[in-house]
Each structure stands twice: as structure tokens, then as C-alpha cells.
Amino acid sequence: MTYTLPGSPVLLRHFTLDDCTVLEANPATMDSDRFSFFGLPVPGRMRRRVESGEAHPKPGEVHGLLVVEAEGVCIGFVSWHPQNYGPINAPTANFGIGLIPSARGKGYGTEAQKVLVDYLFQTTTVNRVEASTDVENIAEQRSLEKAGLLREGVVRGAHYREGRYNDMALYALTRPDYEQARAASSATKITTGFSASR
């Protein structure tokens, strides 16, 4: 089973063991992706999740992991988990993405995030999706903006990477914003006064 949007060059699908091989051969390193390197990966962790079925999200779940596929091959993954604000269980879906080095800079990340946002609003009851990235990661900030998310601000000192605490840029889209953009046009981008700049 796959999920995509009309005209998108990427699709989202469940993991296979072959996908694990691709991702294991392309781990994040300080040289390949300093914004995604948080230490050495646990060998076989993803394989165990795939074999147990844990890596396959069930419909409506506010946590999950899917493969990003382009041109018939695994080029990375997207993941999401619940983020609650307050004591009432009304989760936000906080998501992230990881692409293998050869897939970066081709627009696949933007497309995958567009498809994931649509998937989450179509298959879960979340009222908000959000993502954050290091304030130095200008490429991902632009990708999130192109995917239709709004920059809401900076979360100071929230992210530990490269031996220090770093600020994170927070992006989000609410269900009403999503529905308004979808009604206007599938290509509509909602904008604010914020932009991804240094």
C-alpha cells in the first residue's frame, strides 16, 4: 500500500527489509548530514522494528514511520509522534524526515513532507502538524515553507547537537489552514512575514 499526491514524484509506503539495507548503507554522519547526526546508529534496530511489525503504523495512529520512495527506490523515511500541549489529550503530530545523501537537493524532501502532511490530516484526527529544524539548517527551513508550513518562531536552546545546545525553528500547519489551502488549490502556499533566511 502506498500514499502520494497527484503529480508528486514521491510516495510513502511501509518499510521492507530491503529498505533497511539501503538506509543502513547510508547512515547520517558528521560529513554527510551534520543536522541529523546524533551518534552511531544501533545496528539492526530498524530490521527488528520491521520484522516485529512495529515499524508499520496503523490507521489513525499519531506515531509512525514510512519509507519515502522516488523512481521506484527507497530514498529515506518520514516519521511522526504525538506532541501534547496541555493536559487534555489533543495531540499534535510532530514529524521529521531523513533522506540519503544522493536524494538531497532534488525537491524530494519538500514533496515527501507535502505528502506526509496530507496523509496525517486525511488519516488522523490531529488538528495540527509541526516540524522543527536547527536554525542553521536553511535548506530544511525552505523545504518546510515550500511544503506549506508556517514558521511560528524559534525555540531557544532546545536541541543538543555538536556538543552544544542549539536553537530550533518551529514550523506548523493547523487543520483549518490545511483545509483552506486545499480548497483554494493543491499548490497553494500559505505565507506569513517569516522566511528561511540567516
Give the residues covered by each predicted segment.
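Conserved hydrophobic/aromatic "anchor" residues
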Residues: 15, 119-121, 149
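Positions that flank functional sites
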Residues: 42, 136, 159
